[in-house]
Regions:
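Lipolytic serine-hydrolase domain surface
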Residues: 1-69, 74-79, 85, 106, ...
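The conserved beta1-alpha1 loop
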Residues: 93-97, 170
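Residues lining the SAM
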Residues: 96, 178, 202
Length: 271
């Protein structure tokens, strides 16, 4: 497989040659495009990733063929517009979660697009995660700092000609996503001019009461959001412990409670 991954990020550009963006926060949003290839030996759900001591082999591993940086939003929007037009007017925005380095986020959206056979234009929104398990508080603050940037990125995708914008958020990325959608609702444009498609909330690392308040401000969506939860999610169990033993949305035991908000709750505990 070959996929052009468009990137909007609140990360700082890295000083290391082998790393494009690092875990530091940037006050400005940066833009790029990465041409990714998926090896023929790829298995669904997996990311075949080269270890440091292994030679580069696109036949065995996910591989970044080239990286294009854009000097400003205008240049990025022009390139994005051409891709969206060539892909039937569809775009998918993926927002990663906690403990995710830049390269891991790129690999993950590539795997999602490859395995789902997605036909639109993939857009990665990557906020400044420290990429370490001990950076939970830092990541939480970075996610909060990225809310306005994600809101503007969604508006940019709409301006670039997308007729349908799908969203997949994972873990702590759901906090950024829900805050951006809440801000869109406050501005009177909660569905991006009828362009909002599927909104998938996968294992959301959000306090249940906070989510309820976000949905109350957003309102019942015209098309139900899709929530994937599991009551045996170890990562969310740790998150809940750090938050004072408060239940997280992604492992909430009362999915029928959430369904009243206009959300299809899919319990994957037994899967």
């Amino acid at each position: 497989g070959r996929h052009d991954i468009f990137v909007a990020t609140t990360r700082e550009k890295s000083d290391r040659p082998a790393e494009v963006f690092d875990g530091r926060r940037s006050p400005q949003t940066s833009y790029a495009k990465i041409d990714m290839t998926v090896p023929g030996v790829h298995k669904t759900g997996e990311i075949e990733r080269r270890k440091r001591n292994q030679p580069v082999d696109p036949g065995k591993y996910f591989f970044a063929q080239s990286i294009t940086g854009y000097g400003d939003e205008t240049a990025f929007e022009k390139a994005l517009r051409a891709s969206i037009a060539a892909n039937g007017g569809r775009a998918l925005v993926f927002i990663h979660g906690y403990n995710t380095a830049f390269d891991a986020a790129v690999y993950r959206i590539t795997q999602i697009v490859q395995d789902s056979d997605y036909k639109g234009t993939p857009v990665l929104f990557t906020w400044a995660s420290g990429g370490s398990t001990v950076d939970y508080v830092y990541d939480n603050n970075s996610a909060s700092a990225a809310r306005d940037s994600l809101e503007e990125t969604l508006r940019l995708v709409a301006r670039a000609g997308a007729k349908r914008i799908d969203i997949i958020a994972h873990s702590m990325g759901n906090w950024v996503t829900m805050e951006a959608l809440r801000q869109l609702a406050i501005s009177g444009d909660r569905d991006l001019g009828k362009r909002l498609g599927d909104v998938v909330l996968a294992s959301p690392d959000i306090d249940v009461d906070v989510f309820k308040s976000q949905m109350k401000r957003y309102g019942v969506p015209d098309k139900p959001f899709i929530l994937f939860l599991s009551r045996d999610d170890r990562a969310l169990r740790i998150s809940g412990f750090l938050a004072g033993n408060r239940p997280r949305l992604g492992d909430y035991g009362k999915p029928e409670d959430i369904a009243q908000l206009g959300v299809v709750a899919v319990d994957l505990s037994q899967v």
